[in-house]
Amino acid sequence: TINLYAPLYISNYCPGGCAYCGFAADRHQLRKILTDEEFDAELATLKALGINDLLLLTGERTSECDFDFLSFHVKKASQHIPAVSVESFSMTTDEYTVLRKNGCIGVTLYQETYDRSVYEKMHRWGPKRDFIKRLETPEYALTAGMRFFGMGVLLGLSDPISDAISLFLHLQLLRKKYWQTEFSISFPRIRPEAGGFQPPFKIDDKFLARLIFAFRICMPDITLVLSTRESPSFRNKMAGLGINRMSVASKTTVGGYSSETSPSGGQFDIYDTRN
């Protein structure tokens, strides 16, 4: 069985300096947040596609997109979509608790890389530059009682084998402590974005497939996720073998579902454009 979800970007404002991200503050593209009417239109479009699992995304915390803005949209989305999760800025335990009470069932937060020197090089400025805070944030969400928690590294930033081992050990530690939570692992490869970032490490299909199978063998009960960053052919081959959760019909622009001509800049280029 493959569980399908859709990402919904509600803001692309960001003060951060992530070298690999199209939302970074030095990227020259239009910034936008969804109005109430636009958010309603996005939800209606996704519901018409049969989407029942939604992931709300933002950049780092800003005055335009602060905690109250995110919390409002979580609460509103949960009134229309059965499963609502977030992939956003780091928060406190109290803030994650508010999100849970407003209908959020899960949090996705990537460490990006476990190599601290590479992490600090890639996160040039902004709140996300704090390596230790990023590493500790999963426990804030888990302490708040989130039912689902997604982890991952951005493949290509650093030595992928070292990052995969560190991710595995981190996940093992969290699963022992928060055994009632359902965990997932994602395998995002770096995709082209507005800044033209080139990853230091090239990750081919063969290596990615081996990595997915390794996690499936070592953790047979874990949810493994593959997004539309990957090609249709690769996703087709991996569906049901190692992968049991996939994004579908994805848009990385703000307002991209209800408007095919959304002027806002996307976080990265998607590969699998099927609806």
Feature map (PLM): residue ranges:
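Auxiliary Fe-S-binding modules of radical SAM enzymes
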Residues: 176-275
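Core AdoMet radical
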Residues: 25-39, 46-141, 147-151, 155-157, ...
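Catalytic cores of alpha/beta
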Residues: 92-101, 147, 157-172, 231-241
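Conserved mixed alpha/beta catalytic, RNA-binding, or beta-rich assembly cores of soluble enzyme
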Residues: 153, 163, 167, 172-176, ...
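Conserved, mostly hydrophobic/aromatic
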Residues: 18, 56, 109, 141, ...
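Canonical Radical SAM [4Fe-4S] cluster-binding loop centered on the CxxxCxxC motif
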Residues: 5-38
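An N-cap/entry alpha-helix motif that binds or orients negatively charged groups
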Residues: 1-3
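A general structural motif
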Residues: 130-135, 167-168, 203-208
